[in-house]
């Protein structure tokens, strides 16, 4: 039986491409670079808005998706903040390792030795990419949420957080004592509030987001690091949204004779390495002093019927068979992103976001969300509402009629959405595979929605909006009976 994916792929291949390059007749995206994957071609590469040079090759840039009205269109992915497609170098690394995949550590077989070397080399690559200090270690986890829950088991005291955090950096800290500071209208006043909280009562940790997963606003990490250390606290940066867009140097803010960022957490699946691994980087002493996050093989040096002798970090918190392929993928992503021209990447994303924000300003009834009135920096994330349209209905319309993927809902940040005065929003996020043509298509689709309404009828069932009837292969009304997601 043919799967839905194979059916869609076969149908998409029957569409005559608008442009063809000289390499194997690949489809070229309108207004973007050729999507050919030939080694001597800038395949799957979006070009810099400033220089026109290829930035990076990203899987799926030539994906063609069905439209509800019939036909196919190249997918415009504005959901990078949820999960990013794989960099070509990441899939190459995984494919290279797959034939040698085996259980790591203690295996004498050739494949096991190769896998072990690759796994530990991945740890070194990640440490190098973020400029680890001598007393910091890299622990491989499942994702950012896993990393933060791990650290929450190790903190020897209270943790101070803001009320604008993703749930992953809000909920775990209740185990040892969480103190919530309400963010102010400005970043400057928010820093004053954090300092007042740390002055009033000592805390072990300040846990803060590097960039908001809802609005993309970047917090001043240098000032926050200095503030935490000034009052005897350590700092954790939730870099799930920051790491894919900016290079992070843990020692960049180190005071003379002191330390920089103490702990850093991020996910592979947002870092163009969607193979199920995450990272916690941090100072060894707390990690060594805490009980293991999970008890099991690999986390011990010796076991008797009466007691266990736990290994030091990172092995202490990596019990069980690790995700070798995921670790290798994260390392490949870190190496690839570190080798890119950071300024070119930042300028490219800023150009896209300026174009998107300026365009949204011209669409009647659109309100862009913002936390701080004085924020001057952001990554490639924009959240907005459209008067008269539920966010889920807007997202369904964009997908069904225009082949555009966005995210809608509350983005695992309920307190922040409540603070912003909305029950939900639409989030558009850009990445290395986003083109100017994608942004223009999104803006045109929103203008048509506000001006003319949707061309299709939409119904709400099973926790989501869908076109009725649903004509796209693989997406049937039967799927609407799935349990709704309330995140």
Give the positions of each predicted feature:
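Pyridoxal 5′-phosphate
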Residues: 2-487
């Amino acid at each position: 039986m043919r799967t839905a994916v194979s059916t869609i792929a076969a149908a998409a291949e029957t569409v005559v491409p608008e442009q063809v390059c000289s390499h194997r007749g690949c489809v070229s995206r309108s207004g973007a670079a050729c999507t050919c994957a030939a080694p001597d071609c800038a395949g799957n590469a979006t070009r810099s808005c400033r220089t026109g040079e290829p930035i990076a090759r990203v899987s799926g840039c030539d994906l063609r998706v069905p439209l509800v009205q019939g036909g196919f269109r190249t997918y415009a992915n504005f959901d990078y903040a949820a999960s990013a497609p794989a960099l070509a170098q990441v899939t190459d690394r995984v494919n290279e390792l797959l034939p040698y995949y085996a259980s790591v550590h203690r295996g004498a077989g050739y494949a096991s030795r190769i896998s072990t070397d690759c796994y530990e080399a991945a740890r070194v690559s990640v440490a190098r990419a973020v400029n680890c200090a001598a007393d910091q270690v890299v622990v491989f986890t499942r994702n950012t949420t896993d990393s933060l829950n791990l650290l929450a088991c190790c903190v020897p005291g209270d943790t101070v957080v803001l009320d604008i955090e993703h749930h992953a950096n809000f909920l775990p800290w209740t185990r040892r004592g969480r103190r919530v500071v309400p963010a102010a209208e400005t970043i400057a006043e928010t820093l004053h509030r954090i300092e007042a909280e740390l002055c009033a009562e000592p805390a072990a940790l300040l846990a803060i987001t590097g960039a908001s997963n809802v609005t993309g606003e970047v917090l001043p990490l240098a000032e926050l690091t200095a503030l935490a250390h000034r009052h005897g606290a350590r700092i954790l940066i939730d870099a799930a949204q920051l790491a894919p867009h900016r290079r992070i140097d843990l020692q960049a803010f180190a005071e003379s004779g002191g330390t920089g960022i103490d702990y850093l957490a991020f996910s592979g699946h947002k870092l163009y390495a969607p193979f199920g691994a995450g990272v916690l980087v941090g100072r060894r002493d707390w990690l060594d002093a805490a009980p293991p996050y999970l008890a099991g093989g690999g986390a011990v040096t010796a076991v008797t019927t009466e007691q266990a002798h736990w290994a030091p970090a990172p092995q202490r918190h990596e019990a069980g068979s690790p995700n070798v392929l995921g670790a290798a993928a994260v390392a490949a992503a870190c190496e690839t992103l570190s080798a890119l021209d950071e300024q070119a990447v930042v300028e490219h994303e800023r150009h896209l976001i300026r174009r998107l924000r300026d365009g949204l300003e011209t669409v009647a009834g659109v309100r862009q969300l913002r936390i701080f009135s004085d924020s001057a920096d952001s990554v490639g994330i924009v959240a907005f509402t459209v008067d008269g349209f539920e966010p889920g209905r807007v997202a369904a319309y964009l997908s069904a009629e225009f082949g555009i993927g966005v995210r809608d809902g509350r983005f695992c940040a309920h307190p922040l959405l409540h603070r912003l005065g909305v029950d939900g929003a639409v989030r558009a996020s850009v990445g290395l595979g986003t083109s100017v043509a994608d942004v223009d298509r999104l803006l045109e689709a929103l203008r048509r929605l506000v001006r003319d309404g949707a061309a299709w009828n939409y119904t709400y069932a099973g926790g989501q909006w869908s076109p009725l009837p649903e004509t796209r292969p693989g997406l049937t009304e039967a799927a609407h009976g799935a349990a709704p997601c309330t995140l």
